[in-house]
């Protein structure tokens, strides 16, 4: 079964979303930032992208459900006014429609047709004007069929996309008609690998990463970047292994932090599992509650890396 229509829609709305976030970033971000209960920053860009994306999905596939990160329960009115200003450049939605559109992302996931959105993954990177990504995936019963990542600050702006069974492509953020096929690296030895991880120490256990890379005899320093841009780096051969290491087993990864990147790496010939080598299960709701941490790789290095990761993290509770 083809999902060409879903892929075309995802590419189009991620491209526009990159324009929205770039526009927001051109303004001073300090007064546009809000701190959520989990202490991660939320920007006008997050809400603006979610409003726009949800509206476009709902127009085209009105019966589909959307699992997205943000909601409007605590959005201050001054922030919301800025959201409306940015959204209305690209949409004719009224203010009340924008609020309703943001809250279309409240699905609990699971069975059926679902879109999975992280409007700005790597908000701290966005605020630093470094790496962030607009992340959109489409799944049926937890099986990812389409994944698109927009990375506006990566090498002048890139979009990577995949449809299950059709490989992965990379586009300029300004041209989604002419993509080129991408593939993971063929690096055969861990001693030669380029390893990437999150910038923020709250997102991964960097001290354990250091132990793991020493065990694997990695000679290159880690490449640290925010967001699912790391999946893009693996899929395009710019890096060989990505580790996201939990500090304890109580933390549950959110599906919007991984859905698009997971498919793109796999379609580029790589492998993505949790730290125990188990496939990721997106069918259980808004979190990967049956998985712990992430290992993504070019496939060649996967088994050796996972074995060392399991050993180093064997005391996790």
From Swiss-Prot:
Reactions this protein catalyses: adenosine 3',5'-bisphosphate + H2O = AMP + phosphate; 1D-myo-inositol 1,4-bisphosphate + H2O = 1D-myo-inositol 4-phosphate + phosphate
Residues holding Mg(2+) 2: 118, 121, 257
Binding site for Mg(2+) 3: 69
Keywords: Cytoplasm, Hydrolase, Magnesium, Metal-binding, Multifunctional enzyme, Nucleotide-binding
E.C. no: 3.1.3.7, 3.1.3.57
Hydrolase found in the keyword field: yes
GO annotations of cellular component type: cytoplasm
EC category: hydrolase
Biological process annotations from GO: phosphatidylinositol phosphate biosynthetic process; sulfate assimilation
pH dependence, entry free text: Optimum pH is 7. Active between pH 6-8.5.
Positions of Mg(2+) 1 binding: 69, 118, 120
Thermal profile of function: Optimum temperature is 50 degrees Celsius. Active between 10-60 degrees Celsius.
Organism domain of life: Eukaryota
Molecular function via GO: 3'(2'),5'-bisphosphate nucleotidase activity; inositol-1,4-bisphosphate 1-phosphatase activity; magnesium ion binding; nucleotide binding
Cellular localisation: Cytoplasm
Residues binding adenosine 3',5'-bisphosphate, per UniProt: 123, 203, 227, 230, 244, 257
Subunit: Monomer.
Protein family (similarity comment): Belongs to the inositol monophosphatase superfamily.
Protein name stated in the entry: 3',5'-bisphosphate nucleotidase
Upper lineage: Eukaryota, Amoebozoa, Evosea, Archamoebae, Mastigamoebida
């Amino acid at each position: 079964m083809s999902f060409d229509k879903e892929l075309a829609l995802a590419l189009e709305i991620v491209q526009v979303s990159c324009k929205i976030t770039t526009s927001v970033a051109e303004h001073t971000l300090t007064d546009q930032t809000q701190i959520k209960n989990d202490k991660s920053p939320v920007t006008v860009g997050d809400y603006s992208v979610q409003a726009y994306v949800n509206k476009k999905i709902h127009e085209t596939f009105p019966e589909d459900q959307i699992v997205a990160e943000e909601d409007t329960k605590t959005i201050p009115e001054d922030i919301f006014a800025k959201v409306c200003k940015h959204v209305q450049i690209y949409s004719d939605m009224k203010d009340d429609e924008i609020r309703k559109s943001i809250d279309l992302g409240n699905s609990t996931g699971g069975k059926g047709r679902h879109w999975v959105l992280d409007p700005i993954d790597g908000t701290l990177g966005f605020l630093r004007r470094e790496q962030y990504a607009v992340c959109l995936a489409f799944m049926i019963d937890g099986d990812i069929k389409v994944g698109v990542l927009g990375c506006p600050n990566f090498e002048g702006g890139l979009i990577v996309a995949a449809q299950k069974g059709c490989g992965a492509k990379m586009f300029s953020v300004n041209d989604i008609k002419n993509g080129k096929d991408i593939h993971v690296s063929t690096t055969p030895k861990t001693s030669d690998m380029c390893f990437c991880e999150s910038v923020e120490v709250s997102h991964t256990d960097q001290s354990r990463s250091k132990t793991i890379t020493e065990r694997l005899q990695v000679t290159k320093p880690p490449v640290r970047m925010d967001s699912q841009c790391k999946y893009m780096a693996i899929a395009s051969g710019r890096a060989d292994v990505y580790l996201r290491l939990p500090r304890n087993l109580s933390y549950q990864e959110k599906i919007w932090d991984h859905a698009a990147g997971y498919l793109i790496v796999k379609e580029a010939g790589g492998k993505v599992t949790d730290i125990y080598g188990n496939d990721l299960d997106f069918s259980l709701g808004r979190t990967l509650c049956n998985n712990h941490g992430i290992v993504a790789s070019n496939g060649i290095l996967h088994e050796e890396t996972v074995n060392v990761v399991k050993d180093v993290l064997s005391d996790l509770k």
